[in-house]
A protein has these predicted regions:
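Non-heme di-metal
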Residues: 1-58
């Protein structure tokens, strides 16, 4: 059985991580591209989790 509350918490965690990497990119221009790539991946993970939650609710 899928633990929806755990997935929701993971979704929020991925979004927080993405924001953290984006903030780091602003502070470290030399790593900007890499950090934005990581943030993008975190947002993709969050989107996948969101789809799992939505699919489970239907």
């Amino acid at each position: 059985m899928i633990d929806i509350e755990k997935l929701k918490a993971q979704h929020q965690e991925e979004l927080k991580d993405a924001e953290m990497y984006e903030a780091m990119a602003d502070e470290h221009p030399e790593w900007k591209r890499v950090l934005h790539d990581i943030a993008h991946d975190e947002r993709q993970h969050a989107d996948m989790i969101k789809h799992m939650i939505e699919h489970h609710n239907h």
